[in-house]
Amino acid sequence: MSAAGSHNFASMLAGHAADRPDAVALAMAGDYHPEDGYRLYDTLSFKALHERSDALAWGLQERLGITPGERVSMLVTPGFEFFVVGMALYKLGAVPVLIDPGMGREGFLRCVAANQPSALIAIPAGQALSRVFSSSFGSVKRRMTVGGGAWLFGGLSYDACLMPERGPFPMADVAPDSEASILFTSGSTGPAKGVVYTHGMFTTQARLIGRMMGIRAGESDVPCFLPFAMFSVSLGMTVTLPEINFSKPATAKAKAVLAALHHAQADQLVGSPAVMARIIEHGEERGGLRLPHLKRVLTFGAPISPAIHEAFRRLVGENVEIFTPYGATEALPLSVIGSREILAGAGAKTAAGAGTCVGRPIDEVAVRVIPITDGPVSAVDPVPQGEIGEITVRGPMVSPEYKELPQENAVAKVDTAEGRWHRMGDVGYVDESGRLWFCGRKSHRVTLKEGGVIFPDRLEGLFNTHPDVARAAVVGVAGEPVLIVEPKEKMSLRRDELVRALLVLAQTNDEARRVRRVLFYDRFPVDRRHNAKIDRPALAAWAARAR
């Protein structure tokens, strides 16, 4: 690897290709063995991934005409091509625009139109979508189709853009603050926003995650959250893709995830709380799980309850720890906490109404908890220790801006003499030992008509302790807190009995005792990306109609 490309995120792949060329970078289920029916897995080595992405980078540049800095909308399904295309674009210095199709068609098309990509790399279904909704894709001038059908949609095919005869591609000489990608937020707490990722930000995030988790090159990962897989490859891990719908993790079959874990003898599993719930349910039905190679589980998308930590430990033993890094699309990782710390005491405080402990901030991030306000601010003066405020962060893992959204930047970003701060939109506090506690989204706080504010996450931890409650959500209706319960399928109490029990439980907490109304909702609406964040605005609107 030349020094010229040393800041390029793709240089991490180049390093592993040089150090461990024949090691497996990617694996995914292929055909079944014709004789014994055993599932075969296709693999791609680090050398092959590096060389194939070099070959594609040449073709994208010379045959498709893509240039450094150009925005490229990327609609490629999980598989080898996803990684080849992504790495080729980074090497070229182009800017892949990644929009989660799980956010729904209307939101997806709005995001495409807002970012005006000049090129589209997509599977046939994505190309067809761009033709049907041509106004949203009006900026697209160049196309490459992955998977056949290029003649139908125009442009070139994936195979036609591979130029292996050209040899190594001269990786773009980018600065740490050069744009690498635009990743969209899930849209679960408002309109989806395009988050600028720089090459330095990507590289910093990968290295911090590797250090925090103790990841070593040569370990094996089964990711159920596709964006994380690019980090795993960059850290030198073998990534085995499970046979799941990555856009709908709640539909993931535990057998499919476990099959990938067993085949890979995986050290690491990455998934949303929805995936973990499916695996735990499967394990409890069978009286346990045998995962002797597994060292760690990483969860993203929403806090998980102490009960999930406890249930997983019962199934797999104490040697495997679930870690929950705290952060967001705009800033990750900021802190991390594991099962052992939660089960040693932090979880009990959650159950008593303290909120969710997300661990101590890492050294590379500055965290300030500032007074809660909804409009722009000009300073980040902290509230006293222990007081709830808005979590605000600054560091090399924090995105510098939302793309083409000046009004959102004016609210979310605060420029000071120290540098640019990002307001997370989360509320929380720092305890006496320096740990950060999450108390919910700022926009979900409940302002009471008699005065005062309730932070739902604190109360929900209390109500979630009841054995008949699958999940609880506290929302505001006309200035009153309303408890909404997703009951478990098998309940020991009738619903009227459960209401009385929960109201008695509420009397044990000064904030919770303000709850006087309990409603039932059989299956909570959740965000489309992780299928884990509760859609509180939808529940609040429903509760208002149910009066």
What is the role of each PLM region?
Residues 120-122, 259-262, 269, 395, ...:
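AMP-binding/adenylate-forming catalytic core of the ANL superfamily
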Residues 297, 304, 310-325, 329-428, ...:
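Conserved AMP-binding/adenylate-forming
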Residues 473-478, 483, 503-547:
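Conserved C-terminal "lid"/linker of ANL adenylate-forming enzymes
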